[in-house]
């Protein structure tokens, strides 16, 4: 071990120990197609082992944003990896792709093997939920760039779809119906506003349980992002899904139009799904306007699917049989953007 490097703030031995601790978590994510083992210079995946005829690879990358600041404050790191996976796999899912493998990038101020293991444990959990193999990653110790207690995490997902079964949204027409899948809470967006409203302005305590919650505020805020892969793929296989949107940063206003062809808009039936209490809690403390809420947060709907009216019952049945809470939340009309009960929010 280099004492000079350690004196500069980089502990190579701690890094080795972290990798050793990761291995059991990586191992449980293995799936058909994975080649090699942890420690190579690149992760390998044999696409020919799968039954795709005209495979198209679909990739996505994302991070967790300032939700990490709450993990630091709570010293709770075992769910943030789920968020990193969810943000990526739900994106590739929106085009009908089956996630195949995942890589993570973890930058830390100080290599703490126990903390790193907790983070990677969450990544592995997210990979299991999505059917992804964790085939590689990078853990970089960066003293001077991050404090000893800080880190950042990003993820990279690669999925596959048959070329003629990719869901692009181009088949969506006026009259299509919109199905919303319930979120688990805030997911991984809007946390700069969350922290300003609840921590900076209201000075609430993360370890205190406030009405109407049954657990400390910090745990409520750190609830991991829901992963929609398995139920949605089951619905996609029916061939009845014409468009999908992952409701992330920008909320309904920015994300639903991304799946719509030009000249079409989404009319949302406000009140057609239950909005989790964390959102009214935030709105009350921050005195936030409704348009702010729908522009920033998922408001209880984390994923949206567009289907023809004649397919609605079948698709909802498939989703619910896989444990999803699915709601008819609106329809596609001529126009632009998103309206709520006929009133535009901007």
From Swiss-Prot:
Give the gene that encodes this protein: purM
Q: Which GO terms describe its cellular component?
A: cytosol
Metabolic or biological pathway, per its Swiss-Prot or TrEMBL entry: Purine metabolism; IMP biosynthesis via de novo pathway; 5-amino-1-(5-phospho-D-ribosyl)imidazole from N(2)-formyl-N(1)-(5-phospho-D-ribosyl)glycinamide: step 2/2
Please state which protein family the record places this protein in. Answer: Belongs to the AIR synthase family.
InterPro entries reported in the protein's UniProt record: PurM-like_C_dom, PurM-like_C_sf, PurM-like_N, PurM-like_N_sf, PurM_cligase
Subcellular location(s) of the protein: Cytoplasm
Under the heading CDD domains, the entry gives: PurM
An example Pfam family from this entry, by short name, is AIRS
* Organism the protein comes from: Bacillus subtilis (strain 168)
Enzyme class, UniProt record, top EC level: ligase
Keywords on record: ATP-binding, Cytoplasm, Ligase, Nucleotide-binding, Purine biosynthesis
> Per the UniProt entry, what are the Gene Ontology biological process annotations, in alphabetical order?
'de novo' IMP biosynthetic process; adenine biosynthetic process; purine nucleotide biosynthetic process
**What Enzyme Commission number(s) apply to this enzyme?**
6.3.3.1
Q: What is this protein called?
A: Phosphoribosylformylglycinamidine cyclo-ligase
The record's annotation in NCBIfam families points to:
purM (TIGR00878)
Reaction(s) the record says it catalyses: 2-formamido-N(1)-(5-O-phospho-beta-D-ribosyl)acetamidine + ATP = 5-amino-1-(5-phospho-beta-D-ribosyl)imidazole + ADP + phosphate + H(+)
Tell me if Transferase is a UniProt keyword of this record.
no
Residue ranges that the Swiss-Prot or TrEMBL entry lists as coiled coil: none
Molecular function as annotated in GO: ATP binding; phosphoribosylamine-glycine ligase activity; phosphoribosylformylglycinamidine cyclo-ligase activity
